[in-house]
A protein has these predicted regions:
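Amphipathic alpha-helical interaction segments
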Residues: 13, 55, 87, 118, ...
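Hydrophobic alpha-helical bundle segments that form small-molecule/ligand-binding pockets
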Residues: 117-169, 182, 204-207
Length: 222
């Protein structure tokens, strides 16, 4: 019998199958046995491409990081750091919102993941390029990751049930409309993220004049 022209298995195929499982069923659904069954191969064959399940999940996480737009850091003037961070944060959150089950893996940090490291490098480079001292640029990167991944770990509006009787006014006098939140989940959650992001960036802009080193010989401005 003729040998197949292409290998039956590849890293991309494994990552694609694992990503689909994570998206549909969550992290616990991923195992080498389950992946092998989905891919129609033997379990040990996966180890020709990945050492263990954690490496597979890292690759799934990195595939999400690839979706984050970094062009604003390459195209913007260094002094436009605030708007660049804003646009990047929206892109990052959109990528996480599309794949919420992988967020706990991404929240651990980039580790050795190439795409994740490119994100960290782009943010740090943009901040130091705008005049932020390296130590403060590091803190900004950490702050943004905490804020973005934290917002993607769960829905505030989705945490309230669509049942008016759950919020007895005798017990919760200020939650009379809480049962309506679930129907407006996207509006509430995206609005909250934008409000928090603007407040965060406004605060950084105030600090900018205190910390930043001029990038062009002129006084730094907030």
């Amino acid at each position: 019998m003729a040998r197949p022209r292409k290998p039956l298995l590849s890293r991309d195929r494994i990552v694609g199958a694992a990503s689909a499982l994570v998206d549909s069923e969550g992290l616990d659904a991923v195992s080498t046995r389950r992946l092998a069954a989905v891919l129609g191969v033997s379990g040990p064959s996966l180890y020709n491409h990945f050492r263990n399940k954690e490496e597979i999940l890292d690759a799934v996480a990195d595939a999400v990081s690839v979706q984050v737009d970094l062009s604003m850091f390459e195209e913007s003037d260094p002094r436009d750091w605030r708007e660049a961070l804003h646009d990047w944060a929206l892109s990052y959150r959109a990528a996480l919102a599309a794949h919420p089950h992988i967020v706990p893996v991404l929240a651990r940090g980039p580790g050795r993941r190439p795409a994740g490291l490119r994100v960290a490098d782009a943010v740090f480079g943009a901040m130091t390029g705008a005049g932020w001292p390296p130590a403060q640029a590091t803190r900004i990167g950490a702050l943004m990751r905490y804020f973005i991944t934290g917002s993607a770990l769960g829905s505030f509006a989705g945490g309230f049930v669509d049942d008016e009787t759950a919020y007895d006014p005798a017990d919760y006098p200020h939650l009379g409309q809480a049962h309506l939140l679930a129907d407006h989940r996207r509006q509430v959650d995206e609005g909250a993220f934008e409000t928090g992001l603007r407040a965060l960036l406004d605060g950084l802009a105030i600090q900018y004049g205190q910390y930043a080193r001029p990038t062009d010989g002129r006084p730094s401005t907030a």
